[in-house]
């Protein structure tokens, strides 16, 4: 099975789990950010939750601009994982713990994602560490899930350190090991003087990298 098909299967199971258990779509705090994923009406002036579901793009987006900017060839799975859908973060449970998969909520979020991938790759180069790119977080967000760009394997990584625990030989194998997690939506907490410019999982990753940069 390809990474693309494995992601399709996980998302299908994710939606089915919500319908079977709650008879509704998942809920999410969009924080004023519109998305084709939203089911029903959307009011940008409120901070209420919305019902949503992942929406497959008409054309798969890619990271060719990132490759050009950094003169690097990214593992092909990055295009399949991030370029197929618009979606909120996808909570999961697995033998190694609970976490969330990162996805782009809308096109602006996808472009922010590309910039964050660039920042991550630059930081890895600065630290003289092998290139990786993140796909999500574990637990409370102090550990990242990252893909080794050389061979496509999936690992646990702490910001500023090398990948430390291998979880799967490929992103396909990793996705096949996950089970959807049904959980109430978590509203990101704004901590002054910072502002929350990315909902949910984005704020976690941003906080991790802010912490790393303060240490360096």
Curated annotation (Swiss-Prot):
<dbReference type="GO" id="GO:0009898">
    <property type="term" value="C:cytoplasmic side of plasma membrane"/>
</dbReference>
<dbReference type="InterPro" id="IPR037883">
    <property type="entry name" value="Knr4/Smi1-like_sf"/>
</dbReference>
<keyword id="KW-0997">Cell inner membrane</keyword>
<keyword id="KW-1003">Cell membrane</keyword>
<dbReference type="InterPro" id="IPR038228">
    <property type="entry name" value="Syd_sf"/>
</dbReference>
<comment type="function">
    <text>Interacts with the SecY protein in vivo. May bind preferentially to an uncomplexed state of SecY, thus functioning either as a chelating agent for excess SecY in the cell or as a regulatory factor that negatively controls the translocase function.</text>
</comment>
<keyword id="KW-0472">Membrane</keyword>
<dbReference type="InterPro" id="IPR009948">
    <property type="entry name" value="Syd"/>
</dbReference>
<protein>
    <recommendedName>
        <fullName>Protein Syd</fullName>
    </recommendedName>
</protein>
<comment type="similarity">
    <text>Belongs to the Syd family.</text>
</comment>
<dbReference type="Pfam" id="PF07348">
    <property type="entry name" value="Syd"/>
</dbReference>
């Amino acid at each position: 099975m390809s990474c693309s098909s494995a992601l399709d299967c996980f998302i299908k199971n994710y939606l089915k789990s919500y319908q079977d258990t709650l008879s509704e779509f998942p809920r999410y705090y969009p924080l004023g950010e519109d998305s084709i994923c939203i089911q029903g009406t959307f009011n940008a002036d409120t901070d209420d939750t919305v019902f949503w579901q992942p929406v497959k793009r008409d054309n798969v987006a890619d990271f060719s601009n990132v490759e050009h900017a950094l003169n690097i060839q990214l593992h092909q799975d990055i295009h399949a994982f991030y370029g197929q859908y618009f979606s909120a973060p996808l909570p999961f449970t697995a033998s190694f713990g609970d976490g969330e998969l990162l996805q782009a909520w809308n096109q602006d979020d996808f472009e922010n994602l590309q910039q964050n991938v660039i920042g991550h790759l630059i930081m890895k180069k600065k630290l003289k560490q092998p290139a990786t790119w993140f796909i999500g977080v574990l637990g409370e967000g102090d550990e990242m899930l990252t893909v080794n760009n050389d061979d496509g394997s999936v690992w646990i990584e702490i910001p500023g350190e090398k990948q430390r625990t291998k979880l799967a030989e490929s992103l396909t194998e990793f996705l096949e090991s996950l089970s959807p997690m049904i959980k109430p939506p978590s509203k990101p907490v704004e901590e002054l003087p910072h502002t929350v410019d990315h909902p949910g999982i984005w704020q976690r990753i941003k906080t991790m990298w802010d912490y790393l940069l303060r240490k360096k």
